[in-house]
Amino acid sequence: MKNLTAMGGLIAASRLPVLADDPTLFPRRGRWERLVLAYHHIEAGATKPFSLLHISDTHFTEAYAHEDPRRLKLKEIRTQTFGGRQEEALRDSLDWARQNVDFVLHTGDLIDWQSQANFDLVKKYFGDTLFGALGNHEYSRYMWLEKEGKNEAYKEETRAWVSSAYPFDLSVASKVVNGVNFVTMDDVYGYVTPQQVERFRAEVRKGLPIILCLHVPLYTPGIWRAKNKFWRLNGQKFTSAAVPDPAGDYQVQVSDPVTRDFIAYLKTEKQLKAILAGHLHITVQERFSPTAVQYVVGGNFLFHGQEITFS
């Protein structure tokens, strides 16, 4: 496990720091009441059983006083949006993981927008051990205060800054744990590129079972229905089981030829054993293919996570 961490593998829980609790925050809170956890087991063909804590969407909202006024404005607004307890949520998650699982995986939106303070928080908690997937907010400079390109050119403008805090290949990364290949891909705007597809196929050629780790879930009818109910129909009661027409990221996935073909291929790939994703801020799962279920985890800013055991 030490070697995995040194190589930048999945975050080894045994190497996580012992984090002091803040007695002023819920001083009588119990050890079992800190997190909202879902539990899943994946029969992936591991050479030895292991477990991980999967978290996503922490959404740090910090900015130093000397930073851009727009970032200071975002700090004020977005800290209220997320409740101001994101760092506590991550600290509790990592402390629980250190005692209960082997590894930690984060699937994006660890930060809410780009600021030096946010990137410093990433480094504070993970250093050079972080492994996972990026989210769309990792590339957001000023959120709605400027127009985001949502393409490779836009990401390239700040890729070096992002890379300084996220010590893994931002496009496609792979780490093998007990014979199971965890492959992360950048799909933060819904699409994947031909280069990413080829690199994924190279991972398949290794012949190992694969856990695909993404930020934006891949389109399935049930997950899209759940996302639509939570985000677009807030305040409305359920009236129809009809699957809503694709929009946003999902429209990209069903209309972009490369991405559409990649998803179709994945449904036939027998080495794919599961997909782990976030982005939606809700916990939901659905069978993706004959060999794989897609597990979406709720927002870590609300103390959500899921423990996944592998055999």
Predicted regions and their residues:
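Acidic/histidine-rich helix-loop elements
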Residues: 56-88, 140-165, 222, 247, ...
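Short active-site segment of divalent metal-dependent hydrolases/proteases
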Residues: 60, 111-112, 138, 218, ...
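Extended active-site neighborhood of metal-dependent phosphoesterases/phosphodiesterases
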Residues: 30, 34-44, 115-211, 235-238, ...
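His/acidic metal-ligating clusters that form di-metal
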Residues: 92-103, 181-183, 190-288
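N-terminal active-site segment of His-dependent metallophosphoesterases
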Residues: 21-117
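N-terminal export signals
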Residues: 1-21
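Active-site glycine-centered loops adjacent to acidic/histidine catalytic or metal-binding residues
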Residues: 57, 108-109, 135-136, 215, ...
